[in-house]
Amino acid sequence: MSASRGAVIWMTGLSGAGKSTLANALHQRLMEAGHAAIVLDGDVLRRGLNADLGFTPEDRTENLRRIAHVAALFMQQGFVVIAAVISPEHRHRCSAREIVGDGFIEVFVNAPLNVCEARDAKGLYARARRGEIPHFTGISGPFEAPLAPDVVIESDRMPVDESVDRLLAHLAAMGRPGH
């Protein structure tokens, strides 16, 4: 696969919206079709590459800047990069798009807050509501819905397989690895 054929699928949405589930399902389908693909999961990266960062506005900006640069490096090698990151602010997503350049696809994985809370197996929303987690996106921290995402996935209404099909079709329409 040529370097010009890589892409970065930047999945944004609240915690519990289904970003990681969708990212892993898309990754599996891409790999089965013989495409080079990688998932950059925000939670995983925060435990490793970005373990030195907290959740202050400055640290969130740096976290997403690093992820965008890593994503761009993989894309330049022809990978389809699936970044599953909350990226709560419009400016963060604009910055990521600028860093990545051509091949950036913003995907809004949307689900109502009550659905995200119901899916929360770790109890993070409950802890945030008790004030135990400051700056928690959607509770004590803002989430700015994307203004013009390339793709919107309503994860509470659309099955994962159908969502993957929609993303693969979008990739194919862009001339990127897909079907």
Swiss-Prot record:
Provide the species name: Paraburkholderia phytofirmans (strain DSM 17436 / LMG 22146 / PsJN)
The entry's active site is S87
Question: What is the annotated role of this protein in its UniProt record?
Answer: Catalyzes the synthesis of activated sulfate.
Q: Name one GO cellular component term.
A: cytoplasm
User: Looking at the keywords, is Nucleotide-binding present?
Assistant: yes
Cite the EC number: 2.7.1.25
Q: Which Gene3D superfamilies match?
A: P-loop containing nucleotide triphosphate hydrolases
- Report what the protein is called: Adenylyl-sulfate kinase
Keywords on record: ATP-binding, Kinase, Nucleotide-binding, Phosphoprotein, Transferase
Q: What class of enzyme is it?
A: transferase
The UniProt catalytic activity note for this protein reads: adenosine 5'-phosphosulfate + ATP = 3'-phosphoadenylyl sulfate + ADP + H(+)
Q: Name one Pfam family in it.
A: APS_kinase
Q: In which pathway does it act?
A: Sulfur metabolism; hydrogen sulfide biosynthesis; sulfite from sulfate: step 2/3
Q: Which family does it belong to?
A: Belongs to the APS kinase family.
Binding locations of ATP: G13, L14, S15, G16, A17, G18, K19, S20
Report any one BP term from Gene Ontology.
Answer: sulfate assimilation, phosphoadenylyl sulfate reduction by phosphoadenylyl-sulfate reductase (thioredoxin)
Q: Name one GO molecular function term.
A: adenylylsulfate kinase activity
